[in-house]
Amino acid sequence: MEPRPTAPSSGAPGLAGVGETPSAAALAAARVELPGTAVPSVPEDAAPASRDGGGVRDEGPAAAGDGLGRPLGPTPSQSRFQVDLVSENAGRAAAAAAAAAAAAAAAGAGAGAKQTPADGEASGESEPAKGSEEAKGRFRVNFVDPAASSSAEDSLSDAAGVGVDGPNVSFQNGGDTVLSEGSSLHSGGGGGSGHHQHYYYDTHTNTYYLRTFGHNTMDAVPRIDHYRHTAAQLGEKLLRPSLAELHDELEKEPFEDGFANGEESTPTRDAVVTYTAESKGVVKFGWIKGVLVRCMLNIWGVMLFIRLSWIVGQAGIGLSVLVIMMATVVTTITGLSTSAIATNGFVRGGGAYYLISRSLGPEFGGAIGLIFAFANAVAVAMYVVGFAETVVELLKEHSILMIDEINDIRIIGAITVVILLGISVAGMEWEAKAQIVLLVILLLAIGDFVIGTFIPLESKKPKGFFGYKSEIFNENFGPDFREEETFFSVFAIFFPAATGILAGANISGDLADPQSAIPKGTLLAILITTLVYVGIAVSVGSCVVRDATGNVNDTIVTELTNCTSAACKLNFDFSSCESSPCSYGLMNNFQVMSMVSGFTPLISAGIFSATLSSALASLVSAPKIFQALCKDNIYPAFQMFAKGYGKNNEPLRGYILTFLIALGFILIAELNVIAPIISNFFLASYALINFSVFHASLAKSPGWRPAFKYYNMWISLLGAILCCIVMFVINWWAALLTYVIVLGLYIYVTYKKPDVNWGSSTQALTYLNALQHSIRLSGVEDHVKNFRPQCLVMTGAPNSRPALLHLVHDFTKNVGLMICGHVHMGPRRQAMKEMSIDQAKYQRWLIKNKMKAFYAPVHADDLREGAQYLMQAAGLGRMKPNTLVLGFKKDWLQADMRDVDMYINLFHDAFDIQYGVVVIRLKEGLDISHLQGQEELLSSQEKSPGTKDVVVSVEYSKKSDLDTSKPLSEKPITHKVEEEDGKTATQPLLKKESKGPIVPLNVADQKLLEASTQFQKKQGKNTIDVWWLFDDGGLTLLIPYLLTTKKKWKDCKIRVFIGGKINRIDHDRRAMATLLSKFRIDFSDIMVLGDINTKPKKENIIAFEEIIEPYRLHEDDKEQDIADKMKEDEPWRITDNELELYKTKTYRQIRLNELLKEHSSTANIIVMSLPVARKGAVSSALYMAWLEALSKDLPPILLVRGNHQSVLTFYS
């Protein structure tokens, strides 16, 4: 049966389209192995598998597929997996197969056509291309049907037929062949046994033939592409099926996106990986050319040729070797740490900056990255000036100076740095070739010196060179410090010669395999250069004496009896050097290596090579590091330098900047001051690399798993300490300056808070500390002195009730816990998706607005159930809420009384589990969620720039201040506008943007917006009135005290109001003053209210009765059965008996409101004891009416009731 025709695919070259159906000739002509998934061809009468691969749906003709057994309308999640990775070889093989198929079809070849010559090329039997994923060990799976081994004719005829167990087809996925029982892995060289048909396989729509683990399901097998970053260098990230795709219920109708019908492809299909390199021709270096050569050239600097002999003269052979080994210890430890970080995941460009920033975070990385890039830029000038000085010395010897010494250094240095810039800009390949040439010259110079030590000439003996002599070795083994030099000063001079170990790591982005190259190249370079330094130190110390005159007449003719020096024993008298300075010898001549060498010009070439190679390495490193720093946008002002050019993404702008910096310091030509600072910059980088390894190991993050195992966290810490010590040894003031610069940059980056998340060890250690302290805290018993208000605040979306949020934050900030509870109601599936999104969104909103709080969403059928979940489960260990904070239900008179009953039951639930309760009421209300979408309304009002301001009448159904389930806009409302003089003023306006029309709000919403921000500003000199009527353990008093400790509230005075009797007012005042003094709480006044129990005014009683009238049961006016039925159905109703029983308490609430208006109407805020209603005795309507009567028409009021356990104590 012929498959149905389908629309051609627009896939990438070399990748067969999803909708294409290969012909029989094409299938017979080639065995194309693609390292990805394949879709088997399915006859049209075979039913397609269900989306989850768990069965087969019989959908009849309507479910006919595209000829490949797939439904015509794949869902976006299906199309995501329809194309897999294709190597470059496979692409060429597919093209060859297609050409062969076309030729066979033109010749009239049938299904049994023989293999074409292209078959071998397309079979994938040739060796994979170097660097391809297949060559790197990418897994490949062949699915072979047993029938395929019989003959080509059987194979091809069965491909179109249906057997008992499905079509007998051969299909493959490359590489590891999966065989059915009785099949053979190896096919014969001829006939049909060598033919394997290639098909495309979609795990989402056809899993009938894939009876092997990992392929008979939508689940994806583990593969490297699922773990790539979206900006991966080797290919794009391939998405695995989401948990929702595997777990959610199937849709009744598949989503039709038109892709299978030849329409525009879906975005998910466009994002499928093509797994090619970034672009053709990208230059990548191995460990020798990329790391070893660079590190050796950078470590072997001018110091090797012109200072090492002087160091041996000063410190002697023994201490010189010790100096070298001390420097090697520091660099080796740093090399081990670098290797550990470099093998803990894929390393990109950026060198030391990348390693430190991804380990310690952007703060340290940003600081080090900037100074390290600058240090490399200035190092270019240092090395070029060293080269120029050597050239000027040669010119001076031959008396051919151009102007004078200083200007000649500038001219030669400028010309040199221009040439080096040209080599660098030409590309990394040219730069690498130049480094190889310079390394060869350097090695020849070292060899020239070694050969020269074995062929001493008579003419060189007066200059102190006698060849290898035990007398010279013994004399030079000990130190002879002169001119106030010490061991540490000599060490400070030598140590810069040991730096340069990061030369390879600095171009990590240009390495083929940084994880392997950096450890091998860096550590081997340290070993080789150390051996060379030690060898040359011992050689020169064994061949050359410390002092020599250079005078051939200083030979000794007769043997002296008092001869002690090595020169004297070798028949030379250089004793005159003790009284007058000499020009030769280790102590006096910096050109000892040139003198000793067999061919002096080669040493000069070695000096040129050492300086130019180091300059070239630094000229390449600085822009690469700076580009990586700019790409991360740590310093937004430098963003322009992130741009790369060409196939290698070369930082041309960075090259120009580095060139200008280097040229500036070359023209100064005085680097004696800046040199120690640069050395300290390098050492600071080394110290932080070592500290990064220690810190990452200390944090015990599961993500810290370096492939390089030869490191130790304590040795890394020792290395960091040694680096800091060496910084002070080299130059103490430069070390201090380095610390100041690093600290300043660290503070800047910390303040700016760059929007990056690299999973640093700082984050890991933060978690570990929090975990350890939480566990430790769980073993601490509660004590009254350590009580802290830990509030569960039913905010809903945090930005919907800013006044509630800020007020609670004012007394919990840096003192107690604050959790913003949000109850999601509605269909569970939708609510779960919203919660997943809201969790991250609102936590970010809290952090952005500097709210020290946690966001806790929960799904429930209703508000009460959600609050119960939160009260029982929110928090961790001892960090659990102990106080429930609610907004007052302002709309209770218009709301469904079942919602009111649910609201009141939150109080009872909180008291049941020993929570305190705080109710916050603002007369304007708390909920501004209905205003947060108003910006969208403005777009419809904008007609032209000349449109007049439009008054918006905001119509909405008033929602409860407690409704915690409404979806909200993330953007907060702003009503600040700029006046003509540029000052910012608060206006009752809502703006969309600066250029749009200004839309006034109505009066009610204007007041609501003003009230919502009242706790965000300084409260001024006013009072906090505390009505501590009932002893709840002290929470009613503790909250206002905590408010006064905050900056915004510090000018407010606490006034305390208590109930009492008229004949005991003075006594009660003194008793309360004594108690407050013992609690050490400052207060401005204490007022004793002796008339609390006075009957309230009649009009207020009438107003209260009008409020409760709709909610009364009036059982005396109804038959008993009807009344009982109503009470059962509507338990919130107020009975006559209940109203009479609690008349006194009702009057008290009304009376207290009158007293509050009398005494506290001007207070900033009122904190008052919350009346408690006995559960089962007081109806919800009556209790709600009490709260309404008590708190209406007042300044902001907090109704507080602790759990009646002491939270204050006067004991020490």
From Swiss-Prot:
Consequence of changing A498C: Strongly reduced cation-chloride cotransporter activity
Q: How is its activity regulated?
A: Activated following phosphorylation by OXSR1/OSR1 and STK39/SPAK downstream of WNK kinases (WNK1, WNK2, WNK3 or WNK4). Inhibited by bumetanide. Inhibited by furosemide.
Outcome of substituting L671C: Active at elevated intracellular chloride concentrations that are inhibitory to wild-type. Impairs transporter activity. Impairs transporter activity and reduced sensitivity to NKCC inhibitor bumetanide
Keyword field: Acetylation, Cell membrane, Chloride, Deafness, Disease variant, Disulfide bond, Glycoprotein, Intellectual disability, Ion transport, Membrane, Non-syndromic deafness, Phosphoprotein, Potassium, Potassium transport, Sodium, Sodium transport, Symport, Transmembrane, Transmembrane helix, Transport
**Source organism superkingdom:** Eukaryota
This protein's GO CC annotations: apical plasma membrane; basal plasma membrane; basolateral plasma membrane; cell body; cell body membrane; cell periphery; cell projection; cell projection membrane
Q: What is the effect of changing L671 to A/C?
A: Reduced cation-chloride cotransporter activity
Q: Where does chloride 1 bind?
A: G301, V302, M303, P496, A497
Q: What is the effect of changing I507C?
A: Strongly reduced cation-chloride cotransporter activity
Extracellular compartment residues: 396-405, 455-486, 542-598
The reported result of mutating E429A is: Impairs transporter activity
Q: Which residues carry this modification: Phosphothreonine?
A: T203, T207, T212, T217, T230, T266
Question: What cystine linkages occur within this chain?
Answer: C563-C568, C577-C582
The annotated regions of Low complexity compositional bias extend over 150-160
Annotated region (Scissor helix) at: 761-778
A single GO BP annotation from the record?
cell volume homeostasis
Binding sites annotated in the UniProt record for Na(+): L297, W300, A610, S613, S614
**Outcome of altering S613 to C/A/D/T?**
Abolished cation-chloride cotransporter activity
Mod. after translation = Phosphorylated at Thr-203, Thr-207 and Thr-212 by OXSR1/OSR1 and STK39/SPAK downstream of WNK kinases (WNK1, WNK2, WNK3 or WNK4), promoting its activity.
Altering A505C: what's the impact? Strongly reduced cation-chloride cotransporter activity
Q: State the family it belongs to.
A: Belongs to the SLC12A transporter family.
What name goes with this protein? Solute carrier family 12 member 2
Organism (species): Homo sapiens (Human)
